[in-house]
């Protein structure tokens, strides 16, 4: 399955805990059955806040740039500062924000692409149809929380309980023979993108990896905990909770064991939180065989993009970190021999207004990804 089809067909989490016990051998045996060449994964990067992507991808051709500059006024980037992209679309050449040099190189090498004016849509519409209230619009349009859900669930007209990443793993039950929770791994805690009907997600810390239960280094605490877990007189609700907790503990053991075998990357990563998360994802991808998975989703949030003011200044600070993290991750995938097997994509709450509010830009609808 190629990456485009893998994404197209896509259209609850456990607690990260570990216990200082031996990992069940049966879990490790099943985890070694996956051939690396069959591996495929997608990495969803949420630019939380609503990134002003009209200053990430900018028209360079004279007429188109002049229209862009007229609409953006004080938010417009200098035409001479844009990083040129090879090729053109409908006679228009484009460039990237000057901070996106790594993305420029990948695009010009045919290893990256931009999707323009993309966002949740129930049905084709026009401004006139919207003004006449003649069409159905996505739920909660312009609302941060609503539009993040619309993106992650790919259900613009209803409030679905599952995300398209979770549904993707649900649809491939035979692909992952090892640890079920390893199909969806989050570096940013709970999210709707990875919520499936039959599968959940597992949260791992970028810096600390699998987090152990507080107190497990104390023998008395550990014995007391194990005694509670073995209590056969528990109620039905207690039993369900105990089983879920034990599954999380067992999963933590498997993840800890697998991560101890992760490839030591020679690719240098920056030390900011986003690059640290991308490095951890690369390490996790390197142990997919140990985890027994051939199809995975990863999720990470890079927040702080709600730039109602100082858009140019804040983007000049944040876009280099985004570009570096994505670029370093791709280099690490090449080092691992997985560059053609992992697809990374960005989503954001919504696009921004083309016009300036005098300080920055406000909530919009479609944007560039």
Where are these regions (language model features)?
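Active-site lining segments that contact anionic ligands and/or coordinate catalytic metals
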Residues: 295-297, 339-341, 347, 364-367
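Metal-dependent active-site segment of extracytoplasmic phospho-/sulfohydrolases and closely related
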Residues: 326, 333-358
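Short glycine/threonine-rich loop-to-helix capping motif typified by GTGT followed
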Residues: 309-314, 350-366
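Feature for exported/extracytoplasmic and membrane-associated proteins, marking the mature portion
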Residues: 1-335, 368
């Amino acid at each position: 399955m190629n990456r485009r089809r893998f994404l197209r067909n896509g259209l609850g989490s456990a607690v990260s805990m570990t216990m200082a016990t031996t990992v069940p051998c049966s879990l490790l045996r099943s985890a070694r059955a996956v051939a690396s060449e069959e591996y495929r994964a997608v990495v969803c990067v949420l630019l939380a806040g609503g990134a002003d992507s009209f200053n990430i991808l900018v028209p360079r051709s004279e007429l188109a740039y002049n229209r862009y500059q007229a609409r953006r006024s004080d938010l417009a980037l200098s035409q001479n500062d844009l990083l040129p992209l090879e090729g053109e679309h409908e006679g228009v050449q484009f460039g990237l924000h000057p901070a996106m040099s790594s993305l420029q190189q990948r695009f010009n090498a045919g290893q990256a692409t931009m999707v323009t004016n993309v966002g949740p849509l129930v049905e084709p519409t026009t401004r006139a149809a919207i003004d006449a209230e003649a069409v159905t619009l996505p739920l909660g349009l312009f609302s941060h929380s609503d539009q993040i859900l619309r993106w992650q669930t790919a259900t613009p007209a209803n409030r679905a309980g599952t995300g398209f990443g979770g549904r993707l793993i649900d649809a491939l039950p035979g692909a992952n023979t090892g640890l079920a929770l390893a199909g969806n791994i989050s570096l940013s805690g709970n999210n709707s993108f990875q919520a499936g009907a039959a599968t959940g997600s597992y949260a791992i810390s970028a810096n600390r990896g699998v987090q152990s239960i507080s107190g497990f280094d104390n023998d008395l605490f550990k014995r007391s905990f194990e005694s509670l877990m073995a209590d056969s007189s528990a109620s039905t609700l207690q039993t369900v909770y105990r089983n879920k907790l034990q599954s999380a503990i067992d999963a933590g053991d498997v993840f800890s064991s697998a991560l101890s075998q992760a490839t030591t990357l020679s690719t240098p990563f920056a030390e900011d939180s986003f690059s640290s998360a991308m490095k951890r994802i690369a390490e996790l991808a390197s142990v997919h065989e140990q985890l027994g998975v051939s199809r995975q989703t990863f999720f990470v949030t890079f927040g702080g993009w709600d730039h109602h003011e100082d858009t140019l200044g804040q983007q000049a600070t944040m876009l280099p970190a985004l570009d570096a993290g994505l670029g370093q991750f791709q280099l690490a995938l090449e080092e691992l021999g997985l560059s053609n097997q992992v697809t990374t994509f960005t989503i954001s709450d919504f696009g921004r207004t083309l016009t300036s509010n005098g300080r920055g830009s406000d909530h919009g609808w479609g944007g560039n990804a």
